[in-house]
Regions:
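An N-terminal, well-structured beta->alpha segment
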Residues: 5-103, 192-228, 240
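Gly/Ser/Thr-enriched, mixed-charge loops and adjacent short helices
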Residues: 11, 30-38, 42, 151-285, ...
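Conserved phosphate/anionic-ligand binding catalytic regions in large, soluble enzymes, centered on
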Residues: 38-58, 143-146, 232, 236-248, ...
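N-terminal small/polar loop signature for handling phosphorylated ligands or for N-terminal nucleophile
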Residues: 87-150, 250, 255-311
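Short Gly/Thr/Asp-enriched flexible loops that form oxyanion-binding sites at enzyme active sites
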Residues: 99-107, 150-157, 307-327, 363
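Glycine-rich phosphate-binding loop plus the immediately following alpha-helix
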Residues: 156-186, 327-350, 355-364, 420
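Phosphate-binding and adjacent anionic-ligand microenvironments
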Residues: 292, 296-298, 320-322, 340-536, ...
Length: 571
């Protein structure tokens, strides 16, 4: 069926509601808009769905959510998981509540129990709930930090991590088989509740999740000692972090927590920030204003589903607030956990630190200093969560900490996804420890640069939208693969890792070895002088991403090297 035929079917078929038909009638004269909405089925990738909210097969709406859920239901039934059920959470975005209910009722119509949170919750709490309730799967309705017009649908498996092989490919195949809405089941909510299939969850899971968060604290006595002295500014950016973040800080004893009023309440329109991403300085505009008013030590922002954390810290020497990348905040927490566990004699046997391949190389230096195994995985926190499962199954290592450059980390194994709630808690504890010793977080970061080396990292993206953009991204990756550069930013290319082909080619010796990681469309260039660069298409947005890192003899030297590498990459 052509895209125009599909458009006409959506406009006339009684299966579709009147609001959907009205929205589509309004674009009847816009051929390009019709094509963009109907030229493909919204792709169910290895993590789930993500797209612009609206009518059409290439949009997030109740029909594409039902279709994806029917595929998931078919797979769950094939695994005899209907009695275990599925936990479902959602964030503050437009249509999130409706999409969560549609997913639940589709599962219910297939005889599968759904445990649905009574209101918005952080993504990591859903990860926790899957394991706590013994569910076979989990769904969270969120588009993370994307702009307001987006929403998404992420799928988790029974270990509490986002789906990984073989389940990701198997679920994807089942979703692809659902080619007609005649195959999609649903039922009325009151019938599902009466049948005991639709179950509401809330406070009891919140309480258990909160207890697990607090268990990750290493020095609660330091927090209590410094509780009156450390000033924290926090913004949930209109998302799910407000209640759990404030609760954990309060229960640990922090007394001076200032929340940005303008961004405190959940709002899927994100009225104060067009891009609710804690990686973006614009997201901190209100928080930094408040920080200056109250003379805060630390400024924190969580994204709408509270799995990523952005950080600013006051540099007392200049009076200015310094931004921390996800690499920097992750390293501060990693160093603190490893140092204090070693000092207290609580480091487990065979400890492991897990990071993604595009995360800072400083992690390798820290792991080596504490005799901790460093394990690298593909981009995506689901692969870090998967490692915890492997450790438990194979009795090899004990997970101590995991992090990725994109502002996500996890202390503890109560959840299997990145958790900004625990990251806030740990970073505030690190800040308390620093203040007790007459330092700031920035001082602690400078100490780490001095100890391990001046590692600096960058990320640049090129956005290429639509059909032409997708083809252009594919063409660029093909060109990088066929004709790899010999030099980047003044650094020689020493080796090329092609994760799609599972090869690492040493350009000096010509030797070819395996990467040992799952197949993924990622190219990684090992450069001279401890520099590196990695390029890959985004899994959730129409972008190609360039990650890069250097090591310098000082901050100025490292930043100059980083600028040269960036300039060369973006030519």
């Amino acid at each position: 069926m052509s895209y125009m035929e599909t458009y006409k079917e959506w406009c006339t078929n009684p299966y579709f509601d009147e609001n959907t038909k009205a929205e589509l009638a309004a674009i009847g004269d816009d051929a390009a808009e019709i094509e963009d909405r109907f030229y493909r089925q919204l792709e169910f990738g290895t993590g789930g769905l993500r797209g612009v909210i609206g009518a059409g097969t290439n949009r997030m709406n109740i029909y594409t959510v039902r279709q994806a859920t029917q595929g998931l239901a078919n797979y769950i039934l094939s695994q005899n998981g209907q009695e275990k059920g599925v936990a479902i959470a959602h964030d503050s975005r437009i249509m999130s509540t409706e999409f969560a209910d549609e997913a639940a009722l589709c599962l219910n119509a297939n005889g599968i129990k759904a445990y649905v949170f009574d209101s918005l919750r952080p993504t990591p709490e859903l990860s926790f709930a899957v394991r706590e309730l013994g569910c076979i799967s989990g769904i969270v309705i969120t588009a993370s930090h994307n702009p307001r017009e987006y929403n998404g649908y992420k799928v988790y498996w029974e270990d509490g991590a986002q789906i990984t092989p073989p389940h990701d490919k198997n679920i994807l195949a089942e979703v692809a088989k659902v080619t007609s809405f005649d195959q999609v089941k649903t039922m009325k909510k009151e019938d599902a509740v009466a049948a005991g299939l639709y179950k509401v969850i809330g406070k009891e899971i919140d309480d258990r999740y909160m207890e697990e968060l607090k268990k990750q604290s290493i020095h609660p006595e330091v927090i209590k000692e410094m509780a009156k002295d450390i000033k924290i500014v926090y913004t949930p950016l209109h998302g799910t972090g407000n209640l759990p973040v404030r609760r954990v800080l309060k229960e640990l004893g922090f007394e001076q927590v200032y929340v940005v009023k303008e961004q405190e309440l959940p709002d899927g329109n994100f009225p104060t920030v067009s891009y609710p991403n804690p990686e973006s300085p614009k997201a901190f505009e209100f928080a930094l204003k408040l920080a200056k008013e109250v003379d805060a030590d630390i400024v924190l922002a969580t994204d709408p589903d509270a799995d990523r954390l952005g950080v600013y810290c006051k540099d007392t020497k200049t009076g200015e607030y310094v931004t921390f990348t996800g690499n920097m905040s992750g390293m501060l927490i990693a160093e603190y956990i490893l140092r204090e566990k070693k000092a207290m004699g609580t480091m487990p046997e065979n400890p492991a630190l897990v990071e993604t391949i595009v995360t800072t190389d400083m992690a390798k230096a820290i792991a080596a200093a504490y005799n901790v195994k460093l394990i690298e995985v593909l981009t995506g926190f689901k692969y870090i969560g998967e490692q915890i499962k492997f450790f438990e199954q194979q009795h090899t290592y004990h997970y101590v900490f995991g992090l990725e450059e994109s502002y996500g980390c996890l202390a503890g194994t109560y959840a299997r996804d990145k958790d900004a709630c625990v990251a806030v808690m740990m970073l505030c504890e690190v800040a308390s420890w620093c203040k007790k010793h007459g330092k700031t977080l920035w001082d602690a970061m400078l100490d780490m640069y001095e100890k391990y080396g001046y590692y600096r990292e960058g990320l640049e993206t090129k956005t290429l939208k639509g059909i032409d953009g997708a083809a252009q991204i594919q063409s660029m990756m093909s060109e990088y693969r066929t004709n790899p550069p010999k030099e980047l930013g003044g650094h020689r290319v020493l080796a090329v890792r092609d994760y799609k082909e599972d090869t690492r080619k040493d350009l000096v010796t010509g030797e070819v070895t395996k990467t040992g990681l799952p197949a993924s469309n990622v190219l990684y260039y090992e450069l001279s002088d401890n520099a590196w660069c990695c390029v890959r298409p985004s899994g959730t947005e129409p972008k190609i991403k360039y990650y890069f890192g250097v090591k310098g003899t000082s901050l100025a030297d490292a930043d100059a090297k980083l600028a040269a590498l960036k300039e060369d990459l973006l030519k």
